[in-house]
Structure formats: structure tokens, C-alpha cells
From Swiss-Prot:
Catalytically driven reaction(s): Endonucleolytic cleavage of RNA, removing extra 3' nucleotides from tRNA precursor, generating 3' termini of tRNAs. A 3'-hydroxy group is left at the tRNA terminus and a 5'-phosphoryl group is left at the trailer molecule
Comment on bound cofactor: Binds 2 Zn(2+) ions.
Gene name as annotated: rnz
Positions of the catalytic residues: 64
Descriptive protein name: Ribonuclease Z
InterPro entries registered for this protein in UniProt: Metallo-B-lactamas, RibonucZ/Hydroxyglut_hydro, RNase_Z/BN
Similarity comment: family membership: Belongs to the RNase Z family.
Organism: Sulfolobus acidocaldarius (strain ATCC 33909 / DSM 639 / JCM 8929 / NBRC 15157 / NCIMB 11770)
């Protein structure tokens, strides 16, 4: 299960929807995707701890996605953070943070590590290229598949001995009173949940190929239906819906909405004509992604 807080959902100049920042939690591991100006202020105002963050991923170095990052790192240090902070993003991200630290005369008192991908016993986090006007990446967060025992079948057949169940889970065959129990008859694979976040992007094959079949796609939907959207390296809400449909994703969240729109209803309405399982999160809205 993933818990997702859409801290800011707008894009471009600061606006009432806030700038990009998405908090994703899974069993004590916390990820922040993008960190626009004002992200830490929103977190403080609504009692969302940034001290618990394990990893921050930055899609690209346009200001609305990254200007909040130096500030949140400095505040972490002021609050005496000791835990290492993992960072993922474009090749220029490290230079940006070094320059920011140098010219604000500040050095974090904790370790930061720049990584290209992340893996632990439960999760993998990887990036994929998106099609924006500068170097830019999307993020793919996936739970690992788990091998499970069919408890109902074992119960029906009267198998309750934990030693037998353990052997089956280990992939070993078990023989009891001449009856043979094969692991493949009692094991199944539980597919892990997955989230894809595009950051800013025009529609392109590299995005489509990376996000196929994800449970939740958070896609650039800057505009309603502007001819210039692709020239700016952005997508219309209808582009996002078409990609969601082609990629056979489970749910679509429209994201990075331009401040020019006073209401988001037309964007959601147009997208849902193409892909029904679409929603448009409000700033600071909370979403739980779990098995259906």
C-alpha cells in the first residue's frame, strides 16, 4: 500500500494550487518527488514531517520543480538531522546544490548521496527519460512482487504444520504418508503496486513505454487544449488521458495544472471522456493506492 499526499499540484508561476511536490509513503520509507518553492512551508503548516524523508527525486531543474530543495535541506540541518538523505535527478542537480550551498554560505551537517536508482527488499525506484525542453526524467516506483502461500487451499487440505508451509514457501516439495505436495500447487505471485510520475513532458514513446500497466500514473496536464503545449515540452489533459489509455494504466492523476485556469473542471471533464478512471487532486489531498 502507498500513501500519497499531493502537496502542490500546479505548475509554472506560483499559484493557489501550489508548485510540484508529491509525498509518497510506504511502510516507513518516504519519498518526495519534486520540491517547488513553498513545499516545506506547506508541509510545516499541515504537520507533514520532512525530517522523515528518505529520498528526494527531482524531475528537472526548472525553478517550479527545484527551488524549494535548497531550503528544505537547510532546514533539515537546522533541525539537527543525522540520517543520510538520498537524492535522484538530472546530472546537473549535484552542481546546483553545491552552488546553492556555496553562495548561501551553508553546509549541511548530514550526508547526502546522489544515486541513479534505488532498491531495497520491498521497493525499486528507477527513472525514465521524458520529453521536455531540458534534461528531464520521470520516476517509476514499484513494490516488488511477493511469493505467497495459498492459505485457503492448505486449510481445506488440512495442512497446518508451519514446517510444511515453510518448506513449500522455500520451493521444496513435501511428502507426507506417500502424498506429495508440490510448491507450485500452493504458491502464487502477488504483483506489487506501481506508481509512475512524469514530471514535465510532451507526449512521447519513452514515457509510454516506461509506464505501461502501472497502478497510478501522475502525468503532466499543464493545459486544457493548447496547440503550443508540445512546443513548451508539456501535455494537454487529453494527451495524458490518451497515454493512460494506450498504456493500460489503472488510474490517472492530472498534474502540473497551469495557473491560467480558475477552475479545473473542464480539464477533468475532457480527460474523462477518453479515460474514465481519471482524477484531478486538490492541493494537500490524500490518496491511498492499494489492491483493488
Amino acid at each position: 500500500m502507498f500513501e500519497i499526499i499531493f502537496i502542490g499540484v500546479g505548475g509554472g508561476a506560483p499559484n493557489k494550487r501550489g508548485l510540484p511536490g508529491i509525498l509518497i509513503r510506504r511502510e516507513g520509507f518516504e519519498i518526495l518527488l519534486d520540491c517547488g518553492e513553498g513545499t516545506q512551508n506547506k508541509m510545516i503548516e499541515h504537520s507533514i514531517s520532512f525530517m522523515k524523508l528518505n529520498l528526494i527525486g527531482i524531475s528537472h531543474l526548472h525553478g517550479d520543480h527545484v527551488l524549494g530543495l535548497p531550503g528544505i535541506i537547510q532546514t533539515m540541518a537546522m533541525y539537527s538531522r543525522q540520517q543520510k538523505l538520498l537524492l535522484m535527478g538530472p546530472t546537473t542537480l549535484q552542481d546546483y546544490l553545491k552552488s546553492s550551498s556555496k553562495h548561501t554560505y551553508f553546509k549541511p551537517g548530514f550526508e547526502t548521496e546522489f544515486i541513479q536508482s534505488y532498491e531495497d527488499q520491498n521497493l525499486t525506484i528507477t527513472t525514465f527519460r521524458t520529453c521536455h525542453t531540458i534534461e528531464s526524467y520521470g520516476f517509476l516506483i514499484k513494490e516488488k512482487d511477493k511469493t505467497k502461500v495459498d492459505a485457503e487451499r492448505l486449510k481445506k487440505e488440512g495442512i497446518t504444520d508451519w514446517r510444511i508451509i515453510r518448506k513449500l514457501k522455500e520451493g521444496k516439495r513435501v511428502e507426507i504418508d506417500t502424498k506429495v505436495f508440490l510448491p507450485e500447487d500452493y504458491l502464487y505471485v502477488k504483483k506489487g503496486l506501481s506508481i509512475a510520475y512524469t514530471g514535465d513532458t510532451a507526449p512521447c514513446d519513452s514515457v509510454l513505454n516506461a509506464i505501461k500497466g502501472v497502478d497510478l500514473l501522475i502525468h503532466d496536464s499543464t493545459f486544457l487544449n493548447e496547440r503550443e503545449a508540445h512546443d513548451y515540452g508539456h501535455s494537454n489533459c487529453t494527451d495524458a488521458a490518451e497515454i493512460a489509455s494506450k498504456a493500460d494504466v489503472k488510474r490517472l492523476a492530472l498534474y502540473h495544472i497551469s495557473g491560467r485556469y480558475q477552475t479545473t473542471e473542464p480539464l477533468l471533464k475532457e480527460a474523462k471522456k477518453i479515460f474514465e478512471r481519471t482524477f484531478l487532486p486538490e492541493p494537500l489531498s490524500y490518496f491511498i493506492l492499494q489492491e483493488e
